[in-house]
């Protein structure tokens, strides 16, 4: 008899997972940061070209209610920022998130996210807060920090803030990656891909590493640095070559955020991807007034995987995608 009915992780490891999550909740309780719950189903998708949301629909036998498309959240970010705009104060959430076309050693279409927003907090201060969190909850060593520009110079001898297409083509050729050049004129996409393939696997080998000041073209929902408009107030966290989290000093400019969403959808068209419905509730919340804050989204399954010295996230999940 096949044993796929059994959990992906051992009961012993699931008990350890439960303890870590309890410790996380205790950490935030002591800091007087409110835990919140927000919808899993959203009336809008996300425009980020790197995210593929699941879509479903609502319908009723009542003729007055028409069939309605709904999206499973890729993160609770938009709803949590609506709470921030409504005056919630600093908040966190542990919840399920969903991303299509993502399955493997470090990916599962359904996964657990820790999302945390801290009011009146700079990017630098947020990095310190997260570093302390890792040390306190998981006994990690104090993290290192390096800028996106510095890490490119260290590994590839390329300045990502001033590089050219020809220089990047040579770099792709050097690493036998020319077959991955599918948008030849998209400088930013080439930079992102080479970072993922030739830099990320070597990051944070001994202890966590924060890479900060991502190029402004990769700002997503982060603000732009006031001293250097070429870079954003965005950072990512890596440990043992694995991305653990993505954080921002949050963008609070309604007009800039709307412009970025529109630009995302244009890029989706260029990549033959479906456009996504822009979340007007979220934009209205920013227009009302998103307070100055920083936030981070941490993949909890990956974090627990590293803490328990496992090789893949299915070893710390009760039932992975293949056993769901």
From Swiss-Prot:
Keyword vocabulary terms for this entry: ATP-binding, Ligase, Nucleotide-binding
GO cellular-component term (any): cytosol
InterPro entries referenced in this protein's UniProt entry, alphabetically: Aa-tRNA-synt_II, aa-tRNA-synth_II, aa-tRNA-synth_II/BPL/LPL, EpmA
EC number(s) reported in the record: 6.3.2.-
GO MF terms, alphabetically ordered: acid-ammonia (or amide) ligase activity; ATP binding; lysine-tRNA ligase activity; tRNA binding
The protein's role, per its UniProt record: With EpmB is involved in the beta-lysylation step of the post-translational modification of translation elongation factor P (EF-P). Catalyzes the ATP-dependent activation of (R)-beta-lysine produced by EpmB, forming a lysyl-adenylate, from which the beta-lysyl moiety is then transferred to the epsilon-amino group of a conserved specific lysine residue in EF-P.
Species for this entry: Buchnera aphidicola subsp. Schizaphis graminum (strain Sg)
Residues binding substrate: 75-77, 117, 250
Any one of the GO BP annotations: lysyl-tRNA aminoacylation
Subunit note: Homodimer.
Residues the entry annotates as binding ATP: 99-101, 108, 243-244, 299
Record-given protein name: Elongation factor P--(R)-beta-lysine ligase
Pfam family, one: tRNA-synt_2
Similarity comment: family membership: Belongs to the class-II aminoacyl-tRNA synthetase family. EpmA subfamily.
């Amino acid at each position: 008899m096949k044993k796929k009915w059994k959990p992906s992780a051992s009961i012993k490891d699931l008990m350890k997972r439960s303890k870590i999550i309890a410790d996380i909740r205790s950490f935030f309780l002591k800091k007087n940061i409110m835990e919140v719950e927000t919808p899993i189903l959203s009336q809008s998708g996300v425009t980020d070209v790197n995210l593929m949301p699941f879509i479903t629909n609502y319908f009723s036998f009542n003729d007055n209610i028409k069939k309605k498309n709904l999206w499973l959240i890729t993160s609770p970010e938009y709803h949590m920022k609506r709470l921030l705009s409504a005056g919630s104060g600093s908040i966190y959430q542990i919840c399920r998130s969903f991303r299509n076309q993502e399955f493997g050693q470090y990916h599962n279409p359904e996964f657990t996210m820790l999302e945390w927003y801290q009011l009146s907090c700079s990017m630098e201060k947020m990095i310190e807060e997260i570093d302390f969190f890792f040390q306190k909850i998981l006994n990690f060593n104090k993290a290192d920090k390096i800028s996106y520009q510095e890490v490119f110079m260290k590994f590839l001898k390329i300045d990502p803030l001033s590089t050219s297409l020809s220089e990047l083509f040579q770099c792709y050729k050097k690493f036998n990656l020319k077959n991955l050049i599918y948008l030849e004129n998209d400088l930013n996409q080439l930079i992102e891909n080479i970072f993922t393939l030739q830099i990320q696997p070597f990051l944070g080998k001994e202890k966590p590493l924060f890479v900060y000041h991502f190029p402004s073209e990769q700002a997503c929902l982060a603000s732009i640095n006031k001293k250097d408009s070429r870079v954003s107030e965005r950072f990512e966290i890596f440990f043992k070559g694995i991305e653990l989290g993505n954080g921002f000093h949050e963008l609070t400019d309604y007009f800039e955020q709307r412009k970025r969403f529109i630009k995302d959808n244009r890029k989706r068209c260029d990549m033959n991807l479906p456009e996504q419905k822009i979340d007007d509730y979220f934009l209205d919340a920013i227009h009302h007034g998103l307070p100055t804050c920083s936030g981070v989204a941490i993949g909890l399954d990956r974090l627990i995987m590293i803490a328990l010295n496992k090789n893949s996230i299915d070893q710390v999940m009760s039932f992975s995608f293949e056993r769901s």
